[in-house]
């Protein structure tokens, strides 16, 4: 079913490790540096990590926004960490907020994505399409969301970036991120609904091809 749905992502990567020209290190050593950077970020921010088994008991992750007093991320076996800030699916029914439990992402949905991507190594904002104070005078950076078609079948899951006149994400294209949505983004979708907000720590192997 084709349906327009919305998603907000807060992303953390260590892409600068793999884009920098450092011929003194092997790929395996850079992967180890990335792992250490992720562990340091988790420790420095006092993040509690839970297993996928723990998470799937209720598919909830604690967050300071929800009043829990701490942040909690679920660790996936592929190195992705996820925190669901807002699962989405909220609707207004005659002035009462209700949750649409079946308003999940499905095959052939067109997903409009707003995101902020930061490099955890440098603290730099590397790509975004939301208004940020530093770039408020460059509206072309956040004029359009990133839109992609979500394809889900029995054997594969992938996202294809759309390229219509209202789908042009300026920074995404200028960085050469291409037409494939990073697999690290897609891992969150089965747990979310329309208008969700999720935070992800995405390792290079699950991120953009430019960081692999």
Q: Where are the model-predicted features located?
A:
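C-terminal motif of bacterial Sec signal peptides marking the signal peptidase cleavage site
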Residues: 16-20
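Sec-dependent N-terminal signal peptides
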Residues: 4-15
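Cross-family detector of peptidyl-prolyl cis-trans isomerase
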Residues: 21-212
């Amino acid at each position: 079913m084709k349906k327009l749905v919305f998603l907000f992502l807060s992303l953390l990567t260590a892409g600068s490790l793999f884009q920098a020209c450092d011929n003194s290190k092997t790929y395996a050593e850079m992967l180890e540096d990335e792992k250490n950077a992720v562990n340091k970020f988790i420790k420095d921010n006092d993040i509690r990590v839970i297993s996928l088994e723990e998470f799937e008991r209720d598919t909830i992750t604690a967050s300071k926004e929800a009043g829990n007093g701490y942040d909690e991320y679920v660790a996936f076996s592929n190195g992705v960490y996820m925190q669901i800030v807002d699962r989405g699916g909220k609707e207004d029914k005659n002035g009462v907020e209700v949750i649409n439990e079946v308003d999940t992402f499905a095959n052939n949905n067109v997903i409009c994505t707003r995101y902020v991507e930061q490099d955890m190594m440098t603290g730099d904002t590397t790509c975004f399409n939301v208004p940020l104070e530093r770039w408020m005078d460059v509206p072309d950076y956040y004029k359009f969301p990133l839109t992609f078609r979500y394809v889900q079948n029995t054997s594969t899951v992938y996202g294809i970036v759309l390229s219509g006149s209202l789908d042009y994400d300026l920074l995404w294209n200028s960085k050469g991120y291409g037409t494939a949505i990073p697999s690290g983004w897609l891992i969150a979708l089965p747990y979310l609904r329309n208008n969700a907000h999720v935070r992800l720590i995405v390792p290079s192997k699950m991120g953009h091809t430019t960081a692999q």
